[in-house]
A protein has these predicted regions:
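Short loop/turn segments immediately following the C-termini of beta-strands
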Residues: 96-98, 169-171, 177, 221-223, ...
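Beta-propeller domains
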Residues: 88-139, 180
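Short coil/turn segments that connect the beta-strands within blades of beta-propeller domains
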Residues: 88-89, 161-162, 212-214, 270, ...
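Residue position within the beta-strands of beta-propeller blades
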Residues: 92-94, 166-167, 217-219, 274-276, ...
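Surface loop/turn motifs at the tips and blade-to-blade linkers of beta-strand repeat domains
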Residues: 74-77, 146-151, 191-199, 252-256, ...
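Beta-propeller domain segments
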Residues: 18-64, 102-104, 110-121, 126, ...
């Protein structure tokens, strides 16, 4: 962002990047395996428009796709961001906000960023720094337990055998766990230190265990939008790590991923898929966020290029040989949609069209004139590959005034085969199931 852009943003939080129609329509060409990549837009003033966080009115809820029923599985949480379902059916919710990162909020730009995040529903309160356990003791009755507390902006969770792992913003910790535990009281063991520091621009650290239980995969976001803090600040970032559970040692599994968040296994191919947030301030329609099957050792462009070999000439220290090898992603998810949550579905408690593919939680845009995201979509798969356009699963997070009643983040499939969605503005976990097959009453 330029100084001029920063100075104009607070007046209305909707700075127009160019003299173009404010209500331009953006179509499905932003999604799929072959998105239309328009020329980037350069302007003195950056586009900033974010839906003001409002929360749900009494009785309010998002709209499920035809053939589904939406219920509140749990309410009155504190900024629920991420979900994990234990083998016994207990649901874990990471309640988390950004950690202190003083060097990511200096100057006018930092102050504006804080204002934008506050408007979006983030940063208004200190991080809960805990994981809450939700146990459905009987249909319509959900117990709430503080499973872990005193954490540091936790996001990722994984269970391997009798060991429970948590990805804080600065480290992966482990705790002993036994089936049925509602609280973990043992002191943690630090497995691996993660990149953090005083910038820690993309602070969330996602976590996924390998099917054989030997490794953990961690999504580590960049320390900037497009390398403006210098490449030294990006050491070991913008990557998915592979951690050896026995030793805690890590290696870079894939790199050039600006902000890799959601991680999921595709069972037919055995591929590791990731949802990635791409860079900002190149225009309303580029580059798209995406999901892709990661190649071991693959480089995906950031910060030098996007979507293969599309050069970002704002990055002055280019690396042509690395760009030449940049892997183009598999499936575009729309520009600036903030596609975060990712979960494979083979659920039996959903309509048949949602039973083979990936659910994606789209937190919603701040960097385009027409709001995008703010919904949960489903991408169908055939033979291990995405096919066809996405299907809206959960919408209605924006009201008629474009205020955010909620914002979806993490997604997971529960032990009944229904979809769970963490809503960090509504402070709710929503449950989406096949109409006529729901087994619980609405949480109050």
């Amino acid at each position: 962002m330029t100084a001029l852009a920063i100075l104009t943003i607070p007046a209305g939080f909707s700075c127009r990047a160019a003299m173009t129609t404010a209500n331009a329509e953006y179509g499905p060409s932003e999604y799929g395996p072959s998105p239309e990549l328009v020329a980037p837009t350069k302007s003195i003033v950056a586009t900033v428009r974010v839906a003001k966080a409002k929360g749900w009115n009494d009785g309010g809820k998002p709209q499920g796709a035809e053939g589904t029923t939406v219920t509140a599985f749990a309410r009155k949480l504190e900024h629920p961001r991420w979900l994990y379902v234990l083998p016994n059916g207990d649901v874990l919710v990471a309640e988390s906000e950004a950690p202190a990162k003083p060097d990511d909020s200096k100057g006018v730009g930092g102050k504006v960023h804080k204002l934008v995040m506050k408007r979006a529903g983030s940063g208004a309160h200190p991080s809960g720094n805990r994981i809450t356990l939700l146990r459905e003791s009987k249909p319509g009755s959900v117990e709430t337990h503080v499973f872990l507390q005193g954490l540091n902006s936790p996001i990722g969770m994984a269970l391997v055998g009798n060991t429970f792992y948590v990805a804080n913003s600065d480290a992966v910790l482990s705790f002993p766990y036994h089936s049925g535990d509602t609280e973990l009281r043992s002191a943690p063991t630090r497995l691996t230190v993660l990149p953090a520091g005083t910038i820690n621009h993309h602070w969330t650290k996602s976590l996924l265990a390998s099917p054989d239980g030997r490794h953990l995969y961690v999504g580590v976001g960049s320390n900037s939008n497009a390398g403006e803090n210098g490449l030294n600040a990006e050491h070991d970032r913008a990557a998915v790590w592979e951690i050896d559970i026995q030793t805690g040692k890590h290696r870079t599994y894939a790199s050039g991923l600006r902000n890799p968040v959601g991680l999921a296994w595709e069972p037919q191919s055995g591929a590791l898929w990731v949802a990635v947030n791409e860079r900002d301030e190149l225009g309303d329609q580029v580059p798209p966020d995406y999901m892709t099957a990661l190649r071991d050792g693959g480089f995906y462009g950031w910060p030098f290029s996007y979507y293969g070999q599309h050069i970002d000439d704002r990055v002055k220290a280019q690396n042509p040989s690395l760009v030449a090898a940049a892997v183009a992603p598999d499936y575009a998810l729309g520009a600036h949609t903030a596609s975060l949550g990712l979960a494979w579905s083979a659920g039996v408690n959903l309509p048949s069209r949602f039973q083979q593919g990936m659910f994606v939680g789209q937190h919603g845009s701040w960097n385009r004139r027409q709001l995008s995201g703010y919904k949960v979509i489903f991408v169908p798969f055939i033979n291990g590959r995405p096919t066809g356009p996405p299907i809206d699963v959960l919408t209605g997070f924006l009201d008629s005034d474009n205020h955010a009643q909620g914002r979806p983040v993490g997604v997971a499939i529960d032990n009944h085969g229904a979809l769970l969605v963490a809503d960090d503005v509504g402070d709710v976990v929503w449950r989406v199931s096949r109409a006529g097959n729901e087994h619980q009453a609405e949480a109050r």
